[in-house]
Amino acid sequence: MSPSKKILVLLLFPILLVSSHPIPAEDPAKQCNLSEDDLTKLKAAISSASSAKAANEDILPSTTLAACPMLKNFTEMLKTVATDMEVLKTQGVSNMEVQLLRESFEEKLNDLAKNKDIFERQANQDTSKAEGEMVEKINKLQLEMAKLQEEIEEQTKQMYVDMIEYIFERLKMNDTEAIDSYAQIVMKTKMHELIMKLKTDRLVLWEMVKYVEGKKNKWVGRKVLNTILDQVNKLKLYKPEEVEIGKNSLVVVWCWKFNSETVYGTTDEDQKSFHLAKLFFPKEKGCKECADVKSRTMCNNDYPKVMVKAFG
């Protein structure tokens, strides 16, 4: 090879290397950088969440979110926290319990907003180092927020469990005056869980439907009726203990329906009842004494007997 060709190959070699092994593109996350205004908005949003106020619009501009994609779900996370804080603020087993719980989370959120490691910059830092640290700060912020969100959700869930237990115990003592505020909340939000608890004790379930009837709210009445029937429909007929729960629950429903103003004329629910009567009382069709259903009846009417006699 002539000297001139050797020189040409040597000149082309670096170009070929670059073409076959291109320089990797810079990680987009490393380009993430937040302005002082962005940091201020984040702090304000966290403070709002601590007061149970969710931001109605995106916290950060689209350009910032494009550069920092890990922050895209931050608005939704804060909205969830704000909603959970609102639940803690307005509902609960006792005002003192909820107040202490809310104050605890409010303090944690405010501490997060004041976190210097996240929200304060170091002076005279070069750009690349500042961007790298910003990614670390955002990751830390997301992690802290996620932990707090999970903790709030767990506490809120436990609060509902306590409320359901409270309603169950008050109904057992026939103390319905004490459960008004709790029942209103639980019936709107946790009806299924409440009835799951009640249906294991037919006496308490009977007290519950009498309580509901006394409120004369047709929407709530129908909701309770459907929840009971739907749960009975899910019971396993090959399990004797579940058959017992189903039979007792149906007799309670039939006792309730006889003179009810709240669930009168619920045709769809009647069809469900007819079907369930066939499943749970197959031996009672055409019965004279109807001993099985009679032994479960806590009311002074014969409607449960009529039901199994006709549809069992």
From Swiss-Prot:
Consequences of knocking out this gene: (Microbial infection) RNAi-mediated knockdown results in reduced replication of duck Tembusu virus in salivary gland after an infectious blood meal. Reduced release of duck Tembusu virus in saliva. Up-regulation of antimicrobial peptides in response to duck Tembusu virus infection.
Organism the protein comes from: Aedes aegypti (Yellowfever mosquito)
Family from the record: Belongs to the salivary protein SG34 family.
Tissue specificity note: Female salivary gland (at protein level). Low-level expression in ovary.
Keyword Coiled coil recorded: yes
Functional summary from the UniProt entry: Possible serine protease.
Signal sequence residues: 1-20
Coiled coil ranges: 95-158
Alphabetical keyword list: Coiled coil, Signal
Protein name as catalogued: Salivary protein SG34
Induction: Blood feeding does not affect expression levels. (Microbial infection) Up-regulated in salivary glands following duck Tembusu virus infection.
Domain of life, source organism: Eukaryota
